[in-house]
């Protein structure tokens, strides 16, 4: 076992991006940046890294078949060492959160527990696993707002709701695209239980609610925001709409819906950030 294996199992690129997202979340919540956002970045980076490690710990048997190059099945990190490493990172992340705010500490603790629960149980639970991933993504915005206080946290609720619903839609469609592979490996997903068509319909409903929620920030950002987000909403609605009527994963993949949704979500982040800074 070497340092490289312990570094790789944290999926550093993924963890750093999550940490940077916390900085963006604070910027959206307040329109400004302070040195304290580096603490937010550190907490999210460490907790995300811990979540990645604990996920590999529980997926060790599956990765032996599907991803033998991952640190645990390749022998770079033992399973017991990975467990100890995961909880060390969790504890370090929670320790850093002590220097933020009580609200941030609470969110960090909830997310740490949810990451363990997701890896151990929820990942293989239809819909609830998807919802957990969506919540973890959306909670970064709550985390950024929480650092600025209750008022900023409440202002971020619509942004978090939009992110949760759009991410949930994408996660459901991704499962529908992977239905054959998941079925072959004995996985249990919502798409396997109800089929591609109904899954796409639920995903479309999620995006419709996300679009409805995207109108709320107009109350404090005004008309320029509404014009920008309306353009993005059209992309997201188009992306989800293309999936309607698909009855199999091949036709669903051909629509490019998940890719378009990802682009739409990134564009919405740009609109939120520009609105927070300039409006």
UniProtKB/Swiss-Prot annotation:
Its main location: membrane. It is found in: Cell membrane. CDD domains: PT_UbiA_DGGGPS. It holds the Pfam family UbiA. It comes from the Archaea. InterPro entries: DGGGP_synth (IPR023547), Prenyltransferase_related (IPR050475), UbiA_prenyltransferase (IPR000537), UbiA_sf (IPR044878). One of its GO terms (cellular component) is plasma membrane. Pathway: Membrane lipid metabolism; glycerophospholipid metabolism. The chain crosses the membrane at residues 5-25, 27-47, 90-110, 127-147, 148-168, 198-218, 219-239, 259-279. Keywords: Cell membrane, Lipid biosynthesis, Lipid metabolism, Magnesium, Membrane, Phospholipid biosynthesis, Phospholipid metabolism, Transferase, Transmembrane, Transmembrane helix. It catalyses: sn-3-O-(geranylgeranyl)glycerol 1-phosphate + (2E,6E,10E)-geranylgeranyl diphosphate = 2,3-bis-O-(geranylgeranyl)-sn-glycerol 1-phosphate + diphosphate. It is a multi-pass membrane protein. Prenyltransferase that catalyzes the transfer of the geranylgeranyl moiety of geranylgeranyl diphosphate (GGPP) to the C2 hydroxyl of (S)-3-O-geranylgeranylglyceryl phosphate (GGGP). This reaction is the second ether-bond-formation step in the biosynthesis of archaeal membrane lipids. Belongs to the UbiA prenyltransferase family. DGGGP synthase subfamily. NCBIfam families: PRK12882.1. This is Digeranylgeranylglyceryl phosphate synthase. It comes from Methanoregula boonei (strain DSM 21154 / JCM 14090 / 6A8).
């Amino acid at each position: 076992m070497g340092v490289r294996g312990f570094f790789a199992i944290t999926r550093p690129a993924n963890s750093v991006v999550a940490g940077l997202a916390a900085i963006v979340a604070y910027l959206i919540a307040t329109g400004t940046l302070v040195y304290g956002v580096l603490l937010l970045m550190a907490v999210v980076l460490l907790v995300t890294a811990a979540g990645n490690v604990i996920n590999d710990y529980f997926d060790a048997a599956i990765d032996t078949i599907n991803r033998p190059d991952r640190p645990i099945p390749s022998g770079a990190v033992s399973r017991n060492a990975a467990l100890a490493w995961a909880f060390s990172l969790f504890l370090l992340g929670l320790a850093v959160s002590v220097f933020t705010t009580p609200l941030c500490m609470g969110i960090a603790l909830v997310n740490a527990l949810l990451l363990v629960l997701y890896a151990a149980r929820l990942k293989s639970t239809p819909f609830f696993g998807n919802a957990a991933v969506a919540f973890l993504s959306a909670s970064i915005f709550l985390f950024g707002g929480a650092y600025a206080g209750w008022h900023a946290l409440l202002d971020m609720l619509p942004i978090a709701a939009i992110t949760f619903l759009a991410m949930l839609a994408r996660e459901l469609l991704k499962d529908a695209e992977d239905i054959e592979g998941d079925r072959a490996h004995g996985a249990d997903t919502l798409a396997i239980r109800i089929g591609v068509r109904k899954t796409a319909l639920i995903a479309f409903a999620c995006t419709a609610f996300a679009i409805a929620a995207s109108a709320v920030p107009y109350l404090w950002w005004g008309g320029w925001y509404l014009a920008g987000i309306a353009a993005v909403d059209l992309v997201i609605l188009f992306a989800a709409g293309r999936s309607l009527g698909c009855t199999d994963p091949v036709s669903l993949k051909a629509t490019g819906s998940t890719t378009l949704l990802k682009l739409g979500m990134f564009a919405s982040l740009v609109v939120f950030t520009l609105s927070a800074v300039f409006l």
